[in-house]
């Protein structure tokens, strides 16, 4: 009987290790130097896709977190970046195919001057965020 419980414990440990944290099911991050990571925006800033995260909310809706890096961006760029966020929503969020196969209801787009681990603060790295509701194939800006 002891041997059986040991096997169950080992199998359980492997299953737990292979299971992702809820809300972190998205595809692996694209390396910043990969051609697929480069994104064009109206402002002309050079953007690199850091990652796309899928986050299931408590109500069951799916949020996308599209995270980009723009090494040349400064705080002074912010006023001219609204069209960049809209373009990213239309060209990236609306066309993204979630791993979960649940249509995304919200897209939170962030642009930072350097990669920042999701969920951490980095006061020395400028970051800008915009949120959009994804509805009927359109991006609807959400003030937050």
Where do the PLM segments sit?
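Polar/charged, Gly/Pro-rich intrinsically disordered segments
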Residues: 102-144
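N-proximal, solvent-exposed amphipathic alpha-helical segments enriched in charged/polar residues
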Residues: 2, 23-61, 72-73, 143
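N-terminal compositionally biased, intrinsically disordered segments and leader/signal-like regions
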Residues: 5, 20-21
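Mature extracytoplasmic domains of secretory-pathway proteins
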Residues: 61-108
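Bacterial N-terminal signal peptides that target proteins for export
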Residues: 1-10
């Amino acid at each position: 009987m002891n041997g059986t419980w040991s096997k169950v414990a080992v199998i359980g440990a492997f299953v737990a290790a292979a299971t992702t944290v809820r809300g972190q099911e998205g595809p692996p991050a694209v390396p910043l130097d990969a051609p697929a990571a480069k994104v064009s925006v109206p402002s002309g800033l050079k953007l690199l896709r850091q990652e796309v995260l899928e986050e299931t909310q408590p109500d069951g809706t799916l949020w996308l977190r599209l995270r980009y890096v723009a090494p040349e961006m400064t705080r002074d760029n912010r006023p001219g970046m609204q069209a960049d966020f809209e373009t990213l929503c239309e060209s990236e969020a609306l066309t993204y195919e979630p791993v979960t196969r649940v249509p995304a209801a919200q897209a939170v787009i962030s642009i930072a001057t350097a990669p920042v681990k999701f969920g951490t603060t980095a006061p020395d790295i400028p970051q800008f965020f915009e949120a959009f509701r994804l509805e009927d194939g359109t991006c609807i800006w959400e003030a937050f």
